[in-house]
Amino acid sequence: MSIAAKDIEPGDIPGNLTGGEFSPYHVFSAEEWSRFRADTPLTLTGEEVKRLRSLNDPVDLGEVRRIYLSLSRLLSAHVEASQILFQQRKRFLSMSDETKTPFVIGIAGSVAVGKSTTARILAELLARWPSSPKVDLITTDGFLYPNAILQRDNMMDRKGFPESYDIGALLRFLSAIKAGRPNVKAPTYSHLTYDVIPDQFQLIDRPDILIFEGINVLQSRDLPADGKIVPMVSDFFDFSIYIDAEESLIHNWYVSRFMRLRETAFQNPQSFFHRYSTISEDAARAIAEGLWHNINLKNLHQNIQPTRPRADLILQKGPSHLTQTVALRKL
């Protein structure tokens, strides 16, 4: 059964991308999108999905069937096309010893919108393709400046904003990945201590696919006045995904997650946020609201949401945290 995509219209995606005949996207309902799965097999179990999803994220096996199997099939087509192009370019350049570099998938979106769940589920699905590709997953958290530096520069309340990341290190990492270098080091981050872990790295050794997840990975920057060439993080992506939802929903998810963490991870005395587990529920909720409005909402408006139109694919979630529409950029 063929499915006719509709052009994106005002209101289909929050923030309104270009509508009508000049739209750069096709938009599908979740049910329409699910039919693109075709014969893609379901290779995850319900228990595995529970293990992969983040706290307070209700994504289940049904959502994997509806959304992720079709997305897996689409990404398989893109990876296959990149491999064909690579072989053609090798012949064109007469470079028989050239090695294919990783296919890099960027995943962006607000805090609490479900980026990590999407990244982990995709990583598992892609690794279980018949070709058994090697898939690695990296988050941008490890590229944040250590808390000591953020505190020194009075930037702790700007954590997660573009200036709180070591962009130089991040770009060097991606450059090495795309150069095909082996054993590239990525710094690691502890959500328990809310800080980069000193001298601890994740080694990325020439995977077939690298998933790179973070709130600002589609961020662009002003061109430098001196005219120097400055690459953007997204310049290294072969495919990009933006996880979207109405602002009010993300707000509710963020506060709800904070309150759940107060009852779980924050109980650990080593947690950076342990102090929030000892105050009243009303006081904790007020703090969560303050963090949302004073930090995360500002970051969403100023830096994250404006990058949405740069994505190849936009997953728009509804109140249940499940995807309602899928926008796919036209070729």
From Swiss-Prot:
It catalyses: (R)-pantothenate + ATP = (R)-4'-phosphopantothenate + ADP + H(+). GO terms for molecular function: ATP binding; pantothenate kinase activity. Keywords: ATP-binding, Coenzyme A biosynthesis, Cytoplasm, Kinase, Nucleotide-binding, Transferase. InterPro entries: P-loop_NTPase (IPR027417), PanK (IPR004566), PRK/URK (IPR006083). ATP binds at G109, S110, V111, A112, V113, G114, K115, S116. It is found in: Cytoplasm. One of its GO terms (biological process) is coenzyme A biosynthetic process. Its EC number is 2.7.1.33. Pathway: Cofactor biosynthesis; coenzyme A biosynthesis; CoA from (R)-pantothenate: step 1/5. The keyword Cytoplasm applies. Pfam families: PRK (PF00485). One of its GO terms (cellular component) is cytoplasm. Belongs to the prokaryotic pantothenate kinase family. HAMAP family: Pantothen_kinase_1 (MF_00215). NCBIfam families: panK_bact (TIGR00554). This is Pantothenate kinase. The lineage of its organism: Bacteria, Pseudomonadati, Pseudomonadota, Alphaproteobacteria, Hyphomicrobiales.
